[in-house]
């Protein structure tokens, strides 16, 4: 179970360790427990909000039915309880922390997708992934991770590339190497690693602590292996000039199929 990591460091929550969904919570309770709030994505070890909510019993997943409080964005808070989790469906309920607007949802799991999506705002399922979860390789998105920038270590919302979790990609990278200087012989001689965030965000470096700062692109080439095929990737841009203003969020890269 993950939250929409595209919200960055806004969307987070806490496990109340309480099974009674009818318990009323207040904004004062949320503020008092702010330090207990965690993120929920699979790309950062400390972003494990829901990790202890499910357990295996007789080779099947079961829920401990703990109630979670989730801040979806400033001023929008919901409580969530997973009632049932099987290989084919998830049953959960959610509502406001004052016990209003409670909804119980049965979500049928699509085996062709890595994830199945639901909107608390619209109270409906959302189609996000392509119909076939093997039809894509990397996703460019925003996610939350712990990092140090300008002598400050904290959780940041970063933008980067994530491998398709439904595939078994391996990767490495070479610093100060042009993409055209890496051939198949060179790529196949390298030791590779497995990590969904193998490409991640570090191919660019923020050059200023202000929001209008520019990004410098690191001079590195990524080597990616999918099954027996090798690819190389080298990023060239993260910004784009639009109407005379430099806007971030437009990654460009070179690719070679070896």
Regions flagged by a language model, labelled:
Residues 1-258:
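Surface-exposed, beta-sheet-biased, low-hydrophobicity segments with strongly acidic/polar composition
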């Amino acid at each position: 179970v993950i939250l929409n990591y595209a919200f960055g460091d806004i969307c987070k929550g806490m496990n109340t360790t309480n099974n009674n969904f009818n318990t009323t919570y207040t904004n004062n309770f949320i503020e008092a427990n702010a330090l207990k709030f965690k993120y929920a994505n699979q790309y950062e070890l400390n972003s494990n909000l829901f990790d202890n909510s499910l357990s295996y019993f007789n080779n099947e997943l079961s829920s401990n039915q703990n109630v979670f409080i989730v801040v979806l964005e400033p001023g929008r808070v919901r409580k969530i309880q997973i009632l049932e989790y099987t290989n084919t469906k998830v049953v959960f309920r959610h509502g406001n922390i004052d016990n209003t607007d409670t909804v119980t949802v049965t979500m049928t799991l699509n085996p062709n997708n890595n994830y199945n999506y639901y909107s608390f705002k619209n109270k409906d399922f959302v189609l996000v992934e392509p119909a076939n979860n093997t039809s894509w390789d990397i996703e460019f998105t925003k996610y939350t991770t712990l990092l140090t920038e300008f002598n400050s270590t904290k959780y940041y919302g970063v933008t980067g590339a994530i491998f398709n979790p439904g595939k078994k990609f391996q990767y490495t990278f070479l610093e100060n190497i042009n993409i055209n200087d890496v051939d198949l012989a060179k790529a196949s001689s390298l030791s590779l690693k497995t990590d969904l965030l193998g490409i991640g965000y570090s191919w660019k470096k923020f050059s200023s602590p202000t929001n209008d700062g520019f990004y410098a692109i690191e001079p590195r080439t990524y080597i990616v292996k999918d099954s027996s095929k090798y690819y190389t990737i080298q990023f060239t841009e993260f910004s784009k000039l639009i109407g005379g203003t430099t806007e971030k969020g437009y990654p460009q890269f070179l690719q070679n199929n070896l």
